[in-house]
Amino acid sequence: ILDWNLKTWEKILNWGFWVSSTENLIVANVLRPGNTIIKSAAIEPHVMNLISFLRTAWADIKIRYNHEIIVTWVEKLSDNFEFDIVSDYIEAGTYMIIWALASKEYIDIANARIDDLYGIIEKLKEAWVKVEDLWNDKLRVFKATSLKGIQIQTNIFPWFPTDLQSPFAILQSQADWISKIHEVLFEWRLNFLVELEKMRANVALINPHEALIFGPNKLKGWVTVTSWDLRAWAAMIIAWLIAEWETKVTNVEYIYRGYEDFINKLKNLWADLEEVND
């Protein structure tokens, strides 16, 4: 929605807490004449990193603590500087879940920023996963010998991210007793649980936003599962890693949207998987 204030020529953009739209609005308005206020802006780590990048290039961007970002027009940006891109905290969180379930003892994850992972680490610890801070953006995640069923509710940063509820559901499937997922931000993002049922997971979809998982489940392979969602596809791979027998996961192209060299990284850590072209 565009709300033009003709007295100050200030353009106010009211938006949802979406990461991509926030990033696009910031970039689109840096060199656009006038001042822009982006309301309900996302503040995820990669949004903050984009702002830091643009500030290094002499952009005039201010952040308010009520999810407002103010972009003031500049005539030109610098193109002569160096900048470090932050690691993806969703990718780091995915690997934390994988190693809690599938590692032999523990694994160290480098370039994992603790502040970005707070909401994830707290839920892993609540589920009895041991996580150690080795400092200098390095984490040690231990294989879980037992897991506690817990409730997760997705939310905007810094709370538990919607992009990790699918992988976390696989961890919940191995926990004792009942776990609950409450997906606040999206409808029908829990549909991947229908695919998980093919692997003999005991789940119940309550409504488009809530589901129960009754554990622990001994997942079985010899089935074909699919996904039309990047994070659900990662969840299916995690389920395959801990399941008995071979599993086939289709729509592999989705994984490349959010994970760098995902298959080979798992193979380097002794996962027995192969990408095939049917």
Model-derived segments and spans:
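Structural preference for solvent-exposed beta-strand-turn elements
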Residues: I1-D278
